Amino acid sequence: LHIKKNVKRKLTDTELQILAAEWSEHCSYKSSKQHLKMLPTTGPNVIVEKGYDSGVLDVGDGYVVTVHIESHNHPSAVEPFGGAATGVGGVIRDILSAGTRPIALFDGLRFGNIENDVHARWLFKNVVAGIANYGNCLGIPTIGGEVEFDTCYKNYALVDVAAVGFGKKSKLIKNHANPGDLVLLIGGATGRDGVGGSQFASDMLEGEDRSAVQIPDPFIEKLIIEAILEARDAKCINAMKDLGGGGLSCAISETAESLGIGIELDVKNVHLRESDLSPDEIMISESQERMLIITNPTKLSKITQICEKFRIQCSVIGKVKKDKMMHVKKGKETLALLPADFVARGPLIDRKKSKPKYLSKLPSSPKLKNKKSLSNVLLELLASPNIASKHWVFRQYDHEVGIRTVIKPG
């Protein structure tokens, strides 16, 4: 009904794939957005700019701190190492998209009972290894976090990763665009990994679909960080966005909507890892380590030179228009033509909610039946994975790389 009301024609296959990605729970927050809007978003030190994917705080003396947190639960439940690692990469690029350097990582993890659940132990071991591998390779310290275990997380895991960035206020990317500006895709090549990942992350976990989990490459991410910061200093970037959930579909539509512009994109110009990718796969691939940049044509030579210096790929995939439309082409063939705000603002769902009945049956003060001595109870508590030292976890993280860490884990 929402589509019929706003488009009034039959959608193409590419348009359907784009909407499926952008309107997934993972990308649109269609169930939670109304609740998230209740949280405060303004304050004396909060800097609000169009298109930012991280919170920006003015900390004085001309400097800012950027903060971003997100979950990567579904991918981590299927492929814990890759799922956790790409979660780290995603939050780092969201920090970078504001024009700040990522300087620290945190994580919050939840698993099943690792004392008697082999699958929970497997998830725990590989999620921690994935976070450690990605952060350590990038040279960004993981300086804090938390880990808890409970049977309610059986066969699943909660993997929240946060990143903090730092930079000069004067060097923040002030997202803007003018008709005729060029749209660039820089970083890793586009492949089949992560195709349909946002829809997959919004579904019930009923089976293993490892192809929907993205492949991490922290070495390319490190090169992207340095290239982006150099391009920022050279004033080559008008606007920038990370390619995360939904891939190009979401990055293009959300950038166009937030800036009030139109974007024309030719999928033939996207650099590929696999030459036989279909246009639909190109649009919804969630291959990692990719950034969307809008630049003035006069800056193309400079930004290309910077990318060549750091040996990362750079492709001109489109241009900015003033019609506020998302136009996807393959050569001269139109594959999708939709209003950018229609794509980016998916319909919201007001789900029914009620207080769980079992809560009323719980005693307010449960009677303790344990007759063990207090010393034995204390020893059992200290042996619990929830209370015991997390040394095994944080010793895998390089929390001193960069020699800026003052308060260390543990």
Positions of the model-derived regions?
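Glycine/proline-enriched, intrinsically flexible loops and inter-domain linkers
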Residues: L1-G410
